[in-house]
C-alpha cells in the first residue's frame, strides 16, 4: 500500500497546504518537515536536519516556510510537535510573528472512545489516507521504512494504541525515532483533516497486518 503510492499515476488534488514538523528529542534523532497538499506530499521527500539546537531549528523552519511561499504555494497551517524542545520552537516562532500551532500528540484524542491518544488517531488518519489508493508520495526510502515499521497494539480497553517509539527504534535497527513518518502524521492534525469523517479502526481491514499503515 505504501510503495504503490510512489509509482501510482494519480491526479493531484488541490487544497490546503499543511506543513508538519517533528522536533528532535535526543541526540540521534532528526528534526523533520513534511509539506502535504490533500493527496500528495510536495517536494522530493521529507526534509530532515540533525544536530541543530533550538535556534537553528527555528531558523530552518522559517527558511523552509519562505521557500514554499517563493514557489507560489501558500501554507495554510504549520503544525509542530510541541512535546519537549518543540514547545520552545513554537514559542519562538510565535514571538517572531510566524503563525504556527503546537500539537501535543500525547493528549487525548478527539475520539476518546476509539483512540488511546492523539498520536494513535493521527496514525490511523494517515492509514486511511493511504487506503484511499489515490495518493502520491516521493521516493523517500526512509519515510517508507518508517511508515512500515510502526506497529499498533491490541489494547484490552478497546482503544487503538501505537507502540512506544523505543520499540520502533529497535525494529528499525538504528538509534533514531521515526522522525520522517512523525512529520507526515502531524499534517493530519490540520483543522481540515480533523473535521472530516473517519472510518472506525474496529472495522475489518482489507488485509491482516500488525502495522498501522
Model-assigned labels for residue ranges:
Residues 20-21, 141-204:
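Charge-patterned, long linear interaction tracts outside catalytic cores
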Residues 30, 89-91, 195:
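Short glycine-/acidic-enriched loop or helix-start segments at secondary-structure transitions
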Residues 1-21, 35, 157-159:
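ATPase catalytic-site recognition across NTP-hydrolyzing enzymes
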Residues 25-32:
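Short, flexible loop/turn motifs enriched in small residues
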Residues 22-24, 83, 106, 184:
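Anionic group-transfer/hydrolysis microenvironments
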Residues 35-159, 205-213:
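Mg2+-dependent endonuclease catalytic cores in nucleic-acid-processing enzymes, primarily RNase H-like
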Residues 11-13, 27, 72, 177:
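Short, flexible hinge/linker loops that cap or flank conserved catalytic cores
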Residues 16, 31, 76, 181:
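Residue-level detector of short, conserved catalytic/binding motifs and their immediate flanks
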Amino acid at each position: 500500500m505504501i510503495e504503490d503510492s510512489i509509482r501510482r499515476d494519480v491526479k493531484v488534488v488541490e487544497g490546503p497546504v499543511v506543513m508538519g514538523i517533528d522536533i528532535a528529542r535526543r541526540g540521534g534523532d532528526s528534526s523533520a518537515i513534511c509539506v502535504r497538499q490533500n493527496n500528495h506530499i510536495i517536494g522530493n521527500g521529507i526534509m530532515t536536519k540533525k544536530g541543530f539546537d533550538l535556534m537553528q531549528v527555528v531558523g530552518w523552519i522559517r527558511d523552509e516556510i519562505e521557500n514554499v511561499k517563493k514557489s507560489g504555494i501558500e501554507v495554510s497551517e504549520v503544525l509542530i510537535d510541541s512535546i519537549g524542545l518543540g514547545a520552545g520552537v513554537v514559542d519562538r516562532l510565535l514571538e517572531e510573528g510566524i503563525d504556527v500551532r503546537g500539537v501535543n500528540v500525547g493528549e487525548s484524542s478527539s475520539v476518546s472512545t476509539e483512540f488511546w491518544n492523539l498520536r494513535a488517531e493521527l496514525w490511523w488518519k494517515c492509514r486511511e489516507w493511504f487506503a484511499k489508493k489515490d495518493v502520491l508520495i516521493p521516493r523517500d526510502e526512509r519515510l517508507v521504512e518508517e511508515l512500515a515499521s510502526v506497529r499498533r497494539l491490541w489494547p484490552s480497553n478497546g482503544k487503538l494504541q501505537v507502540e512506544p517509539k523505543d520499540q520502533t527504534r529497535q525494529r528499525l535497527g538504528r538509534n533514531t525515532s521515526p522522525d520522517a513518518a512523525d512529520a507526515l502524521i502531524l499534517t493530519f492534525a490540520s483543522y481540515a483533516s480533523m473535521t472530516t469523517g473517519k472510518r472506525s479502526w474496529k472495522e475489518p481491514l482489507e488485509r491482516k497486518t500488525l502495522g498501522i499503515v
